[in-house]
Amino acid sequence: MFDIGFLELAVIAVIGLIVIGPERLPEAVRSGATWMAKIRKMMRDTRAEIEVQIGADEIRRELHNEQVMKSLEALKVTKDDIQQHILDADRKMMLEQEAEEAKLQTPVSRRVAGDDPTLGTDDNVFTDPSYAHPPEEPSKVEADTSAETPQANNQDQQPTTKTEPANDR
């Protein structure tokens, strides 16, 4: 409140000692201190009364609350942005995973077929009547011929030409 340094206090003490005298100086200091305490108390009470009348505490609280609410709003916006980024990344990852699963679930013949939609499809399984009945059993003759050795089968498939060895005698 008062900005009094050591030098100013020394000057006031010397003037008080000269004016009041050494006998009454301690009593004057005590009465001055009590008057200062009463003035401070009166100023403190007046300030508190003015603050109550104006509502300074409420204004401070409201200002503080407004600042807190603004920072909360900024945090909510940041939180929403982060959640949106997380959801977008999660959706992207789910789509990639579903695409990978779909790729793994497609038959090999379809993947080999490429762009030709007719290759590798089994759509005619239900419409073609030849699929409705199992193939006929081979007759006994066919079964007996198929049981022959593979060498005999190879001879049937390839024409044989017999070459006679040349006699050198």
From Swiss-Prot:
This is Sec-independent protein translocase protein TatB. It holds the Pfam family TatA_B_E. GO terms for biological process: protein transport by the Tat complex. Part of the twin-arginine translocation (Tat) system that transports large folded proteins containing a characteristic twin-arginine motif in their signal peptide across membranes. Together with TatC, TatB is part of a receptor directly interacting with Tat signal peptides. TatB may form an oligomeric binding site that transiently accommodates folded Tat precursor proteins before their translocation. GO terms for molecular function: protein transmembrane transporter activity. The lineage of its organism: Bacteria, Pseudomonadati, Pseudomonadota, Gammaproteobacteria, Cellvibrionales. It comes from the Bacteria. The Tat system comprises two distinct complexes: a TatABC complex, containing multiple copies of TatA, TatB and TatC subunits, and a separate TatA complex, containing only TatA subunits. Substrates initially bind to the TatABC complex, which probably triggers association of the separate TatA complex to form the active translocon. Residues 98-169 are annotated as: Disordered. It is found in: Cell inner membrane. Belongs to the TatB family. It comes from Saccharophagus degradans (strain 2-40 / ATCC 43961 / DSM 17024). Residues 146-169 have a biased composition (Polar residues). The chain crosses the membrane at residues 1-21. Gene3D superfamilies: 1.20.5.3310. Keywords: Cell inner membrane, Cell membrane, Membrane, Protein transport, Translocation, Transmembrane, Transmembrane helix, Transport.
